[in-house]
Amino acid sequence: MAIGERIHFFRLLRGMTQKYLGMALGFPEKSADVRLAQYETGSRTPKADLTAALAQVLDVSPHALSVPDIDSYVGLMHTLFTLEDNYGLKVSEMDGEVCLKVDVRKSKDTARLHEMLCSWQQAAAMLEAGEISKEDYDKWRYHYPEFDKSQNYVKVPPQDLF
């Protein structure tokens, strides 16, 4: 998903018009909506400083706007393959369902990714149990890692034990 689609998604989520968001970013009123449309359609790509400003106005982390190319299933698959290469993500089967898991023994990076995924799973479980609202869950996701206070990560055994 390109950054323009994420801008569009969060703008609509916040109930903003293109003109409103553009003006909040400091664009002139006459061209604010046109500028935003250019970013949303991908004809222009915001630089880092504008991405940071967009994130602030949209009340999300800049990381929530900048995501890899997952506009197609093939692009998504290659993103997953990269995660397999770099972070030990593995595809497997459990109870007849395809699932993704992290081989925590691969490296320190995979152990850290596992911790982060466990934290995400805990937040999702809290949502499922009704302990937090969808709004709170989305706030947790869209500001990640800012509100990740769990620190209840699984301790990874040393590799020499295997």
Regions inferred by a protein language model and the residue ranges of each:
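Recognition helix of helix-turn-helix/homeodomain-like DNA-binding domains
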Residues: G26-P46, V67-I70
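Long, hydrophobic alpha-helical segments
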Residues: K47-T51
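Short basic helix-loop element that most often maps to the first helix and adjoining turn
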Residues: G4-G26
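Short, charge-rich amphipathic alpha-helical segments embedded
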Residues: P145-P158
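Charged, helix-prone or intrinsically disordered regulatory segments positioned adjacent to compact structured domains
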Residues: A52-E131, D160-F162
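Short, charged, amphipathic alpha-helical segments
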Residues: K134-Y142
